[in-house]
């Protein structure tokens, strides 16, 4: 159903695994996946317009999760596939309400990412 997205995720996955091995001990290479749909132009224009955007999270959740990963010591993880919400929970975040596009929705009403559903 989502060939281009699937190919992109698969390619990213192979790059993470390959580069993590190639650059072992020099740089950590990881992937970060969203737990839910993220409010992006692609979601607005291709996935479902306003209804999809309303059931999405803000891009800032990915930025905060990336910051959490990049703040770790390099030796702590490489070749890993992280999920934004899980990383933030590990750092103590418990309220994900501020990341919702529509604050009236509960987390269980948000659209899950294609590959995590």
Model-identified regions with their sequence ranges:
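C-terminal helical subdomain
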Residues: 31-32, 49-117
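Catalytic loop of short-chain dehydrogenase/reductase
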Residues: 1-26, 33-50
């Amino acid at each position: 159903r989502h060939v281009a997205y699937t190919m992109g995720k698969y390619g990213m996955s192979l790059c993470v695994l390959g580069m993590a091995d190639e650059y072992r001990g020099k740089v950590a290479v990881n992937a970060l996946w969203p737990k839910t749909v993220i409010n992006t132009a692609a979601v607005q224009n291709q996935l479902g317009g306003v209804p999809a955007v309303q059931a999405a999270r803000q891009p800032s959740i990915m930025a905060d999760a990336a910051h959490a990963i990049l703040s770790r010591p390099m030796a702590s993880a490489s070749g890993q596939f992280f999920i934004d919400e899980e990383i933030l929970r590990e750092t103590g975040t418990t309220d994900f309400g501020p990341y919702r596009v529509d604050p009236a929705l509960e987390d269980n009403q948000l659209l899950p990412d294609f590959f995590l559903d």
